[in-house]
């Protein structure tokens, strides 16, 4: 079995999905798409505004529709929103149509990356204990969805991409 043509990066907000997916798309010659950017384009609103004006349930429905559309295409690096794993159909869709890579980050690393960001809808008003509970609730879902897990602890974006490329080669050799 060859590697699926789409690669989906999943992980908690602040794990580095956007930075890694950008570099990885350049290195692998694949098109970069972001579920959040697609939603913002379709809605004409920022993610923060969608959460405020229409609620998280509406956002998650849009996220599922965008993922369905993206999975009909090929040759992409899909930068997934941190909560995409919250809906079971998304997990099935990703596993069927993508090689799913989970960027695993330690809570203290996430906190350090997120504390200066105000554009995180589920973080900006939340305290660390709430973030930890949210992360804890998603961990089993990230792990269940992932074909490959990469720790981002103490690694640069380039190091994470190199490790992903190594894992992709290993995955292709063991799967094919």
Curated annotation (Swiss-Prot):
Query: Which keywords accompany this UniProt record?
Result: Amino-acid biosynthesis, Aromatic amino acid biosynthesis, ATP-binding, Cytoplasm, Kinase, Magnesium, Metal-binding, Nucleotide-binding, Transferase
Quick one: which residues bind ATP?
A: 14-19, 120
Cofactor binding note from Swiss-Prot or TrEMBL: Binds 1 Mg(2+) ion per subunit.
Principal cellular location given in the protein's record: cytoplasm
Q: Which cofactor does it need?
A: Mg(2+)
- Which SUPFAM superfamilies does this one have? P-loop containing nucleoside triphosphate hydrolases
Pathway field of the UniProt record reads: Metabolic intermediate biosynthesis; chorismate biosynthesis; chorismate from D-erythrose 4-phosphate and phosphoenolpyruvate: step 5/7
Compartments, record wording: Cytoplasm
Cite a single GO MF annotation.
Answer: magnesium ion binding
Q: Name one GO biological process term.
A: amino acid biosynthetic process
Q: Which reaction does it catalyse?
A: shikimate + ATP = 3-phosphoshikimate + ADP + H(+)
What is said about its interaction partners and assembly?
Monomer.
Known role: Catalyzes the specific phosphorylation of the 3-hydroxyl group of shikimic acid using ATP as a cosubstrate.
PANTHER family reported for this sequence = SHIKIMATE KINASE, SHIKIMATE KINASE 1, CHLOROPLASTIC
The name of this protein is: Shikimate kinase
Gene source species: Dehalococcoides mccartyi (strain ATCC BAA-2266 / KCTC 15142 / 195) (Dehalococcoides ethenogenes (strain 195))
């Amino acid at each position: 079995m060859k590697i699926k043509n789409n690669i989906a990066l999943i992980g908690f907000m602040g794990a580095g999905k956007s930075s890694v997916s950008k570099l990885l798309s350049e290195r692998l010659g694949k098109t970069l798409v972001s579920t959040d950017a697609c939603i913002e384009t379709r809605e004409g609103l920022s993610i923060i505004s969608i959460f405020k004006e229409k609620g998280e349930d509406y956002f998650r429905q849009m996220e599922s529709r965008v993922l369905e559309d993206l999975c009909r295409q090929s040759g992409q690096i899909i930068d997934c929103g941190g909560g995409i794993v919250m809906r079971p159909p998304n997990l099935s869709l990703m596993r069927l149509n993508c090689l799913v890579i989970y960027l695993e980050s330690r809570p203290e690393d996430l906190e350090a990356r997120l504390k200066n960001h105000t554009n995180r809808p589920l973080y900006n008003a939340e305290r660390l204990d709430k973030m930890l509970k949210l992360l804890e609730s998603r961990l089993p879902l990230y792990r269940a969805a992932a074909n490959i897990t990469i720790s981002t602890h103490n690694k640069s974006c380039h190091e994470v991409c190199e490790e992903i490329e190594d894992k992709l080669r290993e995955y292709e050799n063991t799967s094919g």
